[in-house]
């Protein structure tokens, strides 16, 4: 299996065209952020993008409607929604899951929903095609890692730094051993995210992960750079992932 490239974009007025660019350039799964007024897990870049999307009139309902309208064009791309639980609650759980299914959503990442509540949500909608994606922090105990990993759907998102997303900082010193422990206990790919910016970091991390998530850097580039420049950057990330995979197989 190739290493997974999972970029994140904000659900703004341009998100469908951005999604198509990412799909063109080898994204395996795209995370789409639902804009929220109090995004506690987001760094300043994503927070600013979310505020701007809200000003543009974007919300969960509009994003799901657009995904549904473009579903046939996007059929080769898996996309997941990153959303705070309050958005789902406000929307209505059952209707939200139903609309996600209609829009072709592969899964949900809900950073403020603890594992136990996530399992209850899964149980309530066990016949749904929408996966609840698990997050594991580097501070999690071995027992907790085992429990989360053994119940995981889709993929596991490991948080590489104990901070908000996209801020400068060092990767957790025990990252490799933790990820290998998660992989040993999981039947799904284990990807790393938070704070990843460049091909060098991607090459390092993908030696021992099943893929990487890039958020703030991609949001920043879609806000500021030309499409040509964005595509070149995305190609450099895809290349770094493919070269790591090729080296591992040689």
Curated annotation (Swiss-Prot):
Residue ranges of coiled coil: none
Catalyzed chemical reaction(s): (1S,2R)-1-C-(indol-3-yl)glycerol 3-phosphate + L-serine = D-glyceraldehyde 3-phosphate + L-tryptophan + H2O
Superkingdom of origin: Bacteria
GO molecular function terms listed in the Swiss-Prot or TrEMBL record: tryptophan synthase activity
GO-annotated cellular components: cytosol
Keywords: Amino-acid biosynthesis, Aromatic amino acid biosynthesis, Lyase, Tryptophan biosynthesis
Keyword Cell membrane: no
UniProt-listed InterPro entries: Aldolase_TIM, RibuloseP-bd_barrel, Trp_synthase_alpha_AS, Trp_synthase_suA
Assembly notes: Tetramer of two alpha and two beta chains.
Family the UniProt entry places it in: Belongs to the TrpA family.
Function comment: The alpha subunit is responsible for the aldol cleavage of indoleglycerol phosphate to indole and glyceraldehyde 3-phosphate.
Name of the protein described by the UniProt record: Tryptophan synthase alpha chain
């Amino acid at each position: 299996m190739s290493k997974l490239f999972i970029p994140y974009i904000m659900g703004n007025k341009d998100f469908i065209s951005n999604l198509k660019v990412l799909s063109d350039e080898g994204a395996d799964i795209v995370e789409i952020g639902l804009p929220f007024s109090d995004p506690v897990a987001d760094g300043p870049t994503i927070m600013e993008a979310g505020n701007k999307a809200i000003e543009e009139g974007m919300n969960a309902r509009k994003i799901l409607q657009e995904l549904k309208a473009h579903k046939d064009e996007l059929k080769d791309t898996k996309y997941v929604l990153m959303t705070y639980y309050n958005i789902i609650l406000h929307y209505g759980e059952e209707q939200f899951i139903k609309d996600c299914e209609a829009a072709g959503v592969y899964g949900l990442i809900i950073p403020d929903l603890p594992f136990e509540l996530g399992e209850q949500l899964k149980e309530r909608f066990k016949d749904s095609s929408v996966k609840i994606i698990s997050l594991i922090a580097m501070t999690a105990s071995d027992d907790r890692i085992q429990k989360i990993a053994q119940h995981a759907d889709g993929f596991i998102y490991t948080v590489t730094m104990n901070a908000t997303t996209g801020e400068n900082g060092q990767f957790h010193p025990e990252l490799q051993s933790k990820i290998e422990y998660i992989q040993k206990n999981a039947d799904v790919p284990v990807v790393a995210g938070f704070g990843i910016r460049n091909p060098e970091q991607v090459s390092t991390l993908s030696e021992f992960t099943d893929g990487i998530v890039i958020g703030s850097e991609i949001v920043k580039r879609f806000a500021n750079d030309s499409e040509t420049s964005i595509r070149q950057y995305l190609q450099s990330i895809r290349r770094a992932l493919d070269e790591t995979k090729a080296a591992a197989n040689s």
